[in-house]
Amino acid sequence: MPGVAEAEPHAKKKTLRSSQCATERVQGLRQEYWKQVQQVDPENLVFLDEMGVLLGLTRTHGRSLEGSRVYDLRPFYRGAKVTVVGAISLNQVVALMTLNGSMDSNAFEVFVQQCLVPQLWSGAVVVMDNLPAHSVTRIEPLLQAVGASLLNLSPYSPDFNPIELWWSQLKAFLRQFSPTTAHKVDILLATALDLVNPIHLRNWFANCCYCIS
């Protein structure tokens, strides 16, 4: 029958989420977050997050003839990592910074003070995870100084953060080139940054259920 093939189930990679997301406490916090964020004009929302990039990351899938394996060489690296921290709004990538190794509170404060705050505006609401490295007591005054404010994302809620969709695309882009140095990561990020346009940003916001009309 026409259309039957399209309706048949296919093997797919699972989208896994923490089991904590289903607890009553976290569900309550997620609902509370939506009550707060719905009071904010989407044009003023700025979503912040970070991702880790292992040097030498490469594609894990390839194509081959049926019944044959796919072989490739994996770039050699010693477990080095680059952290990418960024922020996006409905209209633009607001700020982006990379650093070697993991993020700590001092590095995060440098990002906020030197990269993020100069790009903010009065009425901007910065949404971010409530992580120890984010050191809210030191960050909030920096935002308030330019008329911006802070809103903590509910825990276990990456599905509420549009920048996660950009991170997913960025990692797929980086895997195509398997960068083995931080400098190469920076070059590729600059290229990826040029490829982002307002349509992408609006689609990412809409995919996370933020009303953009």
Which ranges hold each PLM region?
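Short functional hotspots at interaction and active-site rims
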Residues: M1-S213
